């Protein structure tokens, strides 16, 4: 398998494994225990499979100890075996698996050369190759936000969008779980923007940002600067993904 094939394979198979854990153990475990079991099963599978197929590559995983040797490595897999754990624990559909390969010498956007996201409960798998154009939508701007931590600036952002695009009326907020699940909704034409100003980590946004860019969307921080990956501090304060003209309208306001 080439790297992109491997990324999609890892996303799909990890998704299958964690979905099976949820199906098998939902009745016997508490929500917290089920989330931990899914996280662990997904992480262990990724560690084992990457060791088999790419033994020289480094791994940055939400569930693993951070080996800072990755900072001098040429290839680093940035993965989240289970993004949206609380939704997974309650058997909700909006959890996902994120897989991204960062390469030091690459000229690719974000230096990410391969990426895959699966949403197991919806049987969705997306990669770097666009399936077709994203459907146009002339109605209210649909903004995906965290189901638990919506941006504190969201009222100001909505007002600016309403002023900039009056013909589209009042923006509509759509709470949802995993970043990967949110991205699939934008790619399907069911939403226009994703905004996070509450902060998260590289494994939350690396795969979604790379796939978004490959599909012609803009992914950046809230001020319009590029996202940077494989950093010593893996915290990412803000991010926005969406149609370029909508993202520009927001980043211009935030500068």
Regions picked out by a protein language model, each given a short descriptive name:
Residues 1-82:
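N-terminal subdomain of lithium-sensitive/metallo-dependent phosphomonoesterases centered on the IMPase/IPPase/PAP
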Residues 14, 18, 39, 50, ...:
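Residue-level signal for inorganic ion chemistry
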Residues 40, 63, 81-84, 120, ...:
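Generic detector of well-ordered alpha-helical packing
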Residues 60-62, 100, 230:
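Solvent-exposed beta-strand sheet faces enriched in polar/charged residues
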Residues 71-130:
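DPxDG-like acidic metal-binding loop motif
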Residues 137-255:
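An extended, acidic
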């Amino acid at each position: 398998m080439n790297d992109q094939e491997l990324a999609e394979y890892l996303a799909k198979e990890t998704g299958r494994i964690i979905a099976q854990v949820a199906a098998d153990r939902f009745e016997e475990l508490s929500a917290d225990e089920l989330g931990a079991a899914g996280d662990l099963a997904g992480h262990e599978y990724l560690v084992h499979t990457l060791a088999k197929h790419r033994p020289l590559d480094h791994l940055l995983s939400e569930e693993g100890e951070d080996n800072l040797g990755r900072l001098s490595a040429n290839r680093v897999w940035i993965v989240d075996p289970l993004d949206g754990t609380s939704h997974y624990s309650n058997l909700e559909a909006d959890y996902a698996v994120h897989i991204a390969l960062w390469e030091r010498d690459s000229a690719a956007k974000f230096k990410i050369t391969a990426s895959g996201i699966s949403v197991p409960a919806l049987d969705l798998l997306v990669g770097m190759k666009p399936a077709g154009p994203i459907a146009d939508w002339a109605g209210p701007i649909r903004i995906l936000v965290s189901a638990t931590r919506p941006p504190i600036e969201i009222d100001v952002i909505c007002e600016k969008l309403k002023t900039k695009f009056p013909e589209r009326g009042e923006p509509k907020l759509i709470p949802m779980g995993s970043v990967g699940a949110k991205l699939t909704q934008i790619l399907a034409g069911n939403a226009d923007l994703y905004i996070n100003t509450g902060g998260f980590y590289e494994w939350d946004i690396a795969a979604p940002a790379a796939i978004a860019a490959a599909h012609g969307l803009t992914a950046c921080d809230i001020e319009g600067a590029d996202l940077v990956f494989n950093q010593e501090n893996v915290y990412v304060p803000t991010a926005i993904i969406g149609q370029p003209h909508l993202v520009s309208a927001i980043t211009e306001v935030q500068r």
